[in-house]
């Protein structure tokens, strides 16, 4: 994985929230996703861009 794409700016994490739960997100480096524990969803990051659509998110129980 490209080093540049495997990081998320901490300031971005402070601004972004889960669109479903409005809860905080954490970065999962292994899967390159933003995770909402509250909604149990993981949002993918593609080409360095977080895809904050519930329809694109992966359920954590999968």
From Swiss-Prot:
Disulfide feature: none
HAMAP family for this protein: UPF0434
Annotated organism of origin: Rhizobium etli (strain ATCC 51251 / DSM 11541 / JCM 21823 / NBRC 15573 / CFN 42)
GO cellular component: cytosol
Residues that span the membrane, as ranges: none
Pfam families: Trm112p (PF03966)
Protein name: UPF0434 protein RHE_CH03977
Similarity comment: Belongs to the UPF0434 family.
């Amino acid at each position: 994985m490209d080093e540049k794409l495997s990081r998320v700016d901490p300031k971005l994490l402070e601004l972004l929230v889960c669109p479903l739960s409005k809860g905080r997100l954490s970065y999962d480096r292994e899967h390159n996703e933003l995770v909402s524990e509250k909604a149990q969803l993981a949002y993918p990051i593609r080409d360095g861009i977080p895809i904050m659509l519930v329809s694109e998110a992966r359920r954590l129980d999968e």
